[in-house]
């Protein structure tokens, strides 16, 4: 069996394989499709124009073009070129594509410039911070901060990440607005420091929300007003006393610092108003209070009179003889006014003290129902014997209480 030798190369001038048969037919078909109106071509007309005897070859070309997304079938024997549809002109798309590519190149150049400037700035900051001569001057004094914000209240807040800060819109009465700052943290405590504390201003108070139990039990410990000097009540006492020096408050030198602490899941509220200035309160407290002259004789307490009268009979007889020998009343006799003992004030029950607490803003319906069901508003206990048939009946029913006897506006508290 003889072996087949190598195939001889085709003679020059012979067309290659891609220039004949299906490749050449595809090139002619695409050219015919581009020349069609609106890109719509009839396959029967294309087969007659290209002198194709077998329409199967035309269908092979259309299937490939449809598979790669260049054409779409409008009907059974008509196709449309997608690049020549309404608003899809080939030349317009090419021009727009060129513009978009040029814009992308320009944006890339700008991005490179910004990256270069960023590197330069970071290197400059590193050179300044790492310099030995500049490291000893890298601080800001307390006076520099206060000088930059003269006339404003500065608060330094140190809180963990995730702390929310809210400044609600002020809603004041009679044109007075009160600004508040709400800080809330669930991950750690919050520290608030007052930076520009003046020596002549009143000490600020930072109250955590909700307030602690010791603050609720002793509200007077938060802010206690200074005691006022007691004025003289009689002219005779003024003449006998030397002139007392005027009392003026002395300010403690140095900057004060306020620190408010709040644990996890707690809030701190710092409030202030434009009309409430601590300087005004300091000026009012520094005004001298002169003695007031009153031409009155206050009476002595009845308890003191009873104790003095029952002390001894000899002292009373001697006082009677002295008073009878005198021609008139003794002008040096002074009587002290009746003063209420602050320790003997009637303490309200716990339920009533919560009602008249000025720090409470509003009362919920649940609290009202709890108070109405407590012993304070329970029906009165009948101490008198049951009335007879001829007695005047004006008693309360077992289901009635103090609110039914008197007009007590419980719901308006």
UniProtKB/Swiss-Prot annotation:
InterPro entries: E2F (IPR015633), E2F-DP_heterodim (IPR037241), E2F_CC-MB (IPR032198), E2F_WHTH_DNA-bd_dom (IPR003316), WH-like_DNA-bd_sf (IPR036388), WH_DNA-bd_sf (IPR036390). The modification N-acetylalanine is found at residue 2. Found in all tissue examined including heart, brain, placenta, lung, liver, skeletal muscle, kidney and pancreas. Differentially phosphorylated in vivo. A motif (DEF box) lies at residues 48-85. Keywords: Acetylation, Activator, Cell cycle, Cilium biogenesis/degradation, DNA-binding, Nucleus, Phosphoprotein, Transcription, Transcription regulation. Its main location: nucleus. It is found in: Nucleus. Belongs to the E2F/DP family. Component of the DRTF1/E2F transcription factor complex. Binds cooperatively with TFDP1/Dp-1 to E2F sites. The E2F4/TFDP1 dimer interacts preferentially with pocket protein RBL1, which inhibits the E2F transactivation domain. Lower affinity interaction has been found with retinoblastoma protein RB1. Interacts with TRRAP, which probably mediates its interaction with histone acetyltransferase complexes, leading to transcription activation. Interacts with HCFC1. This is Transcription factor E2F4.
């Amino acid at each position: 069996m003889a072996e087949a030798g190598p195939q001889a190369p085709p003679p020059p001038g012979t067309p290659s394989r891609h220039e004949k048969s299906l490749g050449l037919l595809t090139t002619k078909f695409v050219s015919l499709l581009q020349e069609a109106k609106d890109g719509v071509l009839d396959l029967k007309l294309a087969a007659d124009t290209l002198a194709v005897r077998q329409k199967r070859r035309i269908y092979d070309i259309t299937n490939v073009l449809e598979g790669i997304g260049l054409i779409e079938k409008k009907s059974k024997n008509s196709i449309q070129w997608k690049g020549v549809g309404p608003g899809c002109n080939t030349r317009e798309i090419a021009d727009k594509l060129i513009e978009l590519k040029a814009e992308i190149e320009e944006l890339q150049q700008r991005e490179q410039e910004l990256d270069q400037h960023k590197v330069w700035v970071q290197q400059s900051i590193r050179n300044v911070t790492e310099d030995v001569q500049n490291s000893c001057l890298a601080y800001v004094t307390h006076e520099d901060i206060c000088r930059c914000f003269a006339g404003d209240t500065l608060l330094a807040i140190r809180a963990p990440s995730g702390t929310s800060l809210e400044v609600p819109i002020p809603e004041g009465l009679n044109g007075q607005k009160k600004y508040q700052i709400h800080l809330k943290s669930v991950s750690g405590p919050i520290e608030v420091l007052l930076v520009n504390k003046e020596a002549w201003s009143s000490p600020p108070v930072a109250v955590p929300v909700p307030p602690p139990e010791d603050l609720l039990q002793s509200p007077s410990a938060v802010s206690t007003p200074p005691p006022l000097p007691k004025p003289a009540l009689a002219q005779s006492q003024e003449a006998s006393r030397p002139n007392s020096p005027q009392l003026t408050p002395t300010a403690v030198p140095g900057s004060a610092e306020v620190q408010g602490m709040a644990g996890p899941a707690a809030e701190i509220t710092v409030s202030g108003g434009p009309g409430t200035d601590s300087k005004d309160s300091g000026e009012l407290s520094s005004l001298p209070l002169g003695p007031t002259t009153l031409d009155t004789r206050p009476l002595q307490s009845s308890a003191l009179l009873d104790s003095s009268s029952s002390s001894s009979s000899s002292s009373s007889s001697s006082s009677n003889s002295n008073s009878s020998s005198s021609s008139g009343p003794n002008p040096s006799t002074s009587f002290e006014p009746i003063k209420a003992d602050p320790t003997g004030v009637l303490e309200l029950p716990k339920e009533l003290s919560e009602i008249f607490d000025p720090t409470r803003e509003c009362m919920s319906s649940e609290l009202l129902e709890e108070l109405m069901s407590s012993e304070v508003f329970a029906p009165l206990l009948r101490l008198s014997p049951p009335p007879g048939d001829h007695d005047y009946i004006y008693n309360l029913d077992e289901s009635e209480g103090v609110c039914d006897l008197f007009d007590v506006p419980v719901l308006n508290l």
